[in-house]
Amino acid sequence: MNTNWLLVNTPEAAKRAAEHLRQASILGIDTEYDSFRYFREKLCLIQIYAKPTTYVIDAMAQLDLSFLARPLKSKSVVKILHAADNDIRLLKRDYGFEFKNIFDTHR
């Protein structure tokens, strides 16, 4: 069981995550959002696994998450998601991220 994780809710933690994610060749990605209290769903959490660490990114902490853009659009990095439609839609809508080389376990 993987117990190596980092809560990303400060600029310092975001910098640590960015340094590791730049070197990753495979990312496991999931998002959590709240659509119960909001007319338009609100992204709350982004979880990214890059061996050997899981990054739990607080999307409500108002961090600069631009460091995610490069690995998400990289053709050389495999992004593994399950039922990726909403995850991709929210990340594109809220951050303008582009995605390439996606493996959706639901399809």
Language-model-derived ranges and their functions:
Residues 1-27, 31:
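N-terminal accessory regions of nucleic-acid-interacting proteins
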Residues 30, 46, 80, 104:
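A residue-level signal for conserved active-site and pocket-lining positions in enzyme catalytic cores
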Residues 33, 61, 107:
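Short, glycine/acidic-enriched loop or turn micro-motifs at the edges of active sites
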Residues 54, 74-79:
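Short active-site oxyanion
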Residues 1-5, 49-57:
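Short, basic, glycine/proline-bearing loop/turn elements
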Residues 37-53:
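A short alpha/beta connector and helix-capping loop motif
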